[in-house]
Amino acid sequence: MNEFWLQINIIVPAAGIDLVCHEMTELGSAGITVEERALDTFVVPDPDADIPETLILKVYFPPEIEPEQLARQVAERLAWLAPLIPGLEVVTPEISRVRAEDWAENWKQHFGIQRIGSRLVIRPTWEAFSPDPQDAVLTLDPGMAFGTGSHATTRLCLEALAELYETPPGPQRVLDVGTGSGILAVAAALLGAGQVLGCDIDETACQVALDNARQNGVIEQIAVTLDPLETLGGDFDVVLANILAEENARLAPELVHRLAPGGVLILSGILNEKEQLVIDAFAGRGLTGPDIRRQDEWSCLCYIKEA
């Protein structure tokens, strides 16, 4: 393990966390933590202003990356994202060096064991845990480029997914669209899915998903692909899409086409105010629903394909 890591702090509106995390992963980030931003007591807020909640991303990169080049690349990615994330400030970030053990300890302060539903457990490697016989335990490590399951969009998906496996064996064929680090795909396999396919447009994300599947002992059940959604076969028992509302809406015909009759469609990454955009896009497509779950400013829509 590297003795030192490069750390960049980025202030991000809450609604843009997933997009910024994705771009940092593409740049080669080895880990990201999210912290609440303390308010500046010397600034009197305008009561009429619509100020989005902001969070601090602490992004860690391997020490062999050249710092000045990294700072420029991060600034370029933020400039590209600025039109998509209202309130995102485009600055050239300062880079600091932190000890590897300091990063790991920072991770440990923020994440503990999470139980999602009656069977799924997310366990950091440093936490001792005695699982029940029916538990599906997903193990995380601070050195893994892996979502923690604590972000609302991911947690809503995990909750909806876990409910499908309350009584084993549960759905067997699962498609995870925009798999990213693979946390949803790995969870599905651990819960009992026999065949899980993750697809993503990012080659790095696909490799990370495979690494995480291997780490959790489900590599035989999971495949990943860069192939476009429209080229994939259908008849999946579950289709997961934790992507932006606009992408869910745009991909509506293809997502529904991938579902087997009676299959479950779980859509997340949707801001509350964009629920209707997604609902309208999936109307009239032979679906029952949606069942809507909400956490903070995020929504998750669940449909069943009519037989």
From Swiss-Prot:
Any one biological process term the GO annotation gives: methylation
Molecular-function GO terms, alphabetical: protein-lysine N-methyltransferase activity
InterPro entries in the record: Ribosomal_L11_MeTrfase_PrmA, Ribosomal_PrmA_MeTrfase, SAM-dependent_MTases_sf
Keywords assigned by UniProt, alphabetized: Cytoplasm, Methyltransferase, S-adenosyl-L-methionine, Transferase
Reaction(s) this enzyme catalyzes, per UniProt: L-lysyl-[protein] + 3 S-adenosyl-L-methionine = N(6),N(6),N(6)-trimethyl-L-lysyl-[protein] + 3 S-adenosyl-L-homocysteine + 3 H(+)
Compartments, as annotated in UniProt: Cytoplasm
Residue numbers binding S-adenosyl-L-methionine: 154, 178, 200, 242
GO CC field: cytoplasm
Cleavable signal peptide: none
EC number: 2.1.1.-
Enzyme class: transferase
Role summary: Methylates ribosomal protein L11.
UniProt xrefs under PANTHER family: ELECTRON TRANSFER FLAVOPROTEIN BETA SUBUNIT LYSINE METHYLTRANSFERASE (PTHR43648:SF1)
Family of this protein: Belongs to the methyltransferase superfamily. PrmA family.
Name used for this protein in its record: Ribosomal protein L11 methyltransferase
Gene from which this protein is expressed: prmA
